Amino acid sequence: MLILTRRVGETLMIGDEVTVTVLGVKGNQVRIGVNAPKEVSVHREEIYQRIQAEKSQPTTY
């Protein structure tokens, strides 16, 4: 895992097309902004896990 330190307003690049910007810090919460192409899915981890769980469940009609 790469660990980086960023200040509010600073950005990091993931590849050529994805940017992650620190928008603010309040207490133990960090607000980040993600810019990515439409074809790149961006989810919070708990939402991503829910999507994956729903995909693995058999569909009943």
From Swiss-Prot:
Keyword GTP-binding belongs to the record: no
Gene3D superfamilies for this protein: Translational regulator CsrA
Keywords tagged on the record: Activator, Cytoplasm, Repressor, RNA-binding, Translation regulation
Cellular component GO terms, alphabetical: cytosol
Keyword Repressor: yes
Gene Ontology BP terms: mRNA catabolic process; negative regulation of translational initiation; positive regulation of translational initiation; regulation of carbohydrate metabolic process
Cellular location(s): Cytoplasm
A GO MF term: mRNA 5'-UTR binding
Coiled coil (UniProt feature): none
InterPro entries named among the record's database cross-references: CsrA, CsrA_sf
Subunit and partners: Homodimer; the beta-strands of each monomer intercalate to form a hydrophobic core while the alpha-helices form wings that extend away from the core.
UniProt record similarity statement: Belongs to the CsrA/RsmA family.
Function of the protein: A key translational regulator that binds mRNA to regulate translation initiation and/or mRNA stability. Mediates global changes in gene expression, shifting from rapid growth to stress survival by linking envelope stress, the stringent response and the catabolite repression systems. Usually binds in the 5'-UTR; binding at or near the Shine-Dalgarno sequence prevents ribosome-binding, repressing translation, binding elsewhere in the 5'-UTR can activate translation and/or stabilize the mRNA. Its function is antagonized by small RNA(s).
PANTHER family: CARBON STORAGE REGULATOR
Name of the protein this chain belongs to: Translational regulator CsrA
The species this protein was found in: Yersinia enterocolitica serotype O:8 / biotype 1B (strain NCTC 13174 / 8081)
Record gene name: csrA
